[in-house]
UniProtKB/Swiss-Prot annotation:
Protein's job: Mitochondrial membrane ATP synthase (F(1)F(0) ATP synthase or Complex V) produces ATP from ADP in the presence of a proton gradient across the membrane which is generated by electron transport complexes of the respiratory chain. F-type ATPases consist of two structural domains, F(1) - containing the extramembraneous catalytic core, and F(0) - containing the membrane proton channel, linked together by a central stalk and a peripheral stalk. During catalysis, ATP synthesis in the catalytic domain of F(1) is coupled via a rotary mechanism of the central stalk subunits to proton translocation.
An MF annotation (GO) of this entry: ATP binding
Residues the entry annotates as binding ATP: G170, D171, R172, Q173, T174, G175, K176, T177
Pfam families the UniProt entry points to: ATP-synt_ab, ATP-synt_ab_C, ATP-synt_ab_N
UniProt cross-references to PROSITE patterns, sorted A to Z: ATPASE_ALPHA_BETA (PS00152)
NCBIfam families according to UniProt: atpA, PRK13343.1
Subcellular location: Mitochondrion; Mitochondrion inner membrane
Name the UniProt record assigns to this protein: ATP synthase subunit alpha, mitochondrial
Gene label: ATPA
Recorded family membership: Belongs to the ATPase alpha/beta chains family.
Amino acid sequence: MNKLAGAELSTLLEQRITNYYTKLQVDEIGRVVSVGDGIARVYGLNKIQAGEMVEFASGVKGMALNLENENVGIVIFGSDTAIKEGDIVKRTGSIVDVPVGKGMLGRVVDALGVPIDGKGALSAVERRRVEVKAPGIIARKSVHEPMQTGLKAVDSLVPIGRGQRELIIGDRQTGKTAIAIDTILNQKQINAQGTSDSEKLYCVYVAIGQKRSTVAQLVKILSEAGALEYSIIVAATASDPAPLQFLAPYSGCAMGEYFRDNGMHALIIYDDLSKQSVAYRQMSLLLRRPPGREAFPGDVFYLHSRLLERAAKMSDQTGAGSLTALPVIETQAGDVSAYIPTNVISITDGQIFLETELFYRGSRPAINVGLSVSRVGSAAQLKAMKQVCGSLKLELAQYREVAAFAQFGSDLDAATQYLLNRGARLTEILKQAQYSPIPIEKQIVVIYAAVKGYLDQIPVALITHYEQELLKSIDPGLLSAIVQQKNITEQISSQLATFCQKFTQSFLATHQS
């Protein structure tokens, strides 16, 4: 009996001993040496990684940016008022990451992915690092699908493709954000028609250093138009600390990359990167990094290049997804040759240049067609659009050239007079109201009418009215034929010509009587 008990006891002991293990949880902690202006110097975190998230005793998070011999420079993601000298700082062991996934759509979050719209916690999300390496050359494919903005001036003259990076640059109050919002609104119809995820385009809007009222207004516009359901808004407003304004674009990019890497398409708008570079300059100077040109740190180019390189069109082997970037840069008095504007122009695949003078003259969107360019977009442009707007750019360029001389002389020859008349009408037809994007097939019809000379007899003042009436009376079958064919065949061309001819005659008859 005792013998049996002894054997049982020994096996029981053996089991217990094998199952016994000591799991030591080691927390590496440091102490705050000094704190101020959103920067904390911490002593004792010797094994910390660059870009690692830390937690202060008050619950505020921070990120290690400067790793020095004696101490670590940490930028604080929140208010530094609750942090004092001697406070304990804990390593989290993880690099800064944010929630990503389809559960983010329709939400407004801060730079760390925390919801700020009062709609409760996020659902069905995974986490992803904010700083990842951009896809390599082999993983990419050249841009070949169009990304429609719904703006006639952009889709015809500076077309954008899925996976492209197109800079929107201009002074303050020239309509930079309006172009970005119109692009988001234009995806509503495309997403509604899209049957699969490979056709839809999800949007991420990153607001950097903007007023809270501006962001609230944007949310209102998007939700009223039903565009919030396929959009994510990342907001690091003017009242947020500089580290959050610096981080927001990377967080938004990580959210967009989720779609890109899962065979879907996304568009990300950084509004604007000038404010991000100012926030980064502030952080760098406070971290005592040496200043360079315009007091920016030496790696301010890398700040933007590593962000914008993450926008890409993926190859078929890697899922054929894409991330299109529309960075916004604000210039001072139209100075495109300043440090940050030249940097971003050299990184992107083209720019849309907006001018104050054009804006006040009533040409809105105020795009300077001469200085705006799309370096890869023409490969992605619809063949039908390419066919109608081939001569548009040339005629506008000739018009600008002649218009300068026409101010001096009154007796102009017939050819010059023709160029002036045509140019004035083409300029007028490219004007468009805010928040009213036009589907690509309707744009094609309008530009076709303008380029083929049907507007030459119409008074300039009536052109907007002509355009509205034209789009109302066109046969929907003709529009759907353009969409399906993606090409203006001889049959479509003759139908368009007949329609424009008849419509122009009836329009003139009505308005001359």
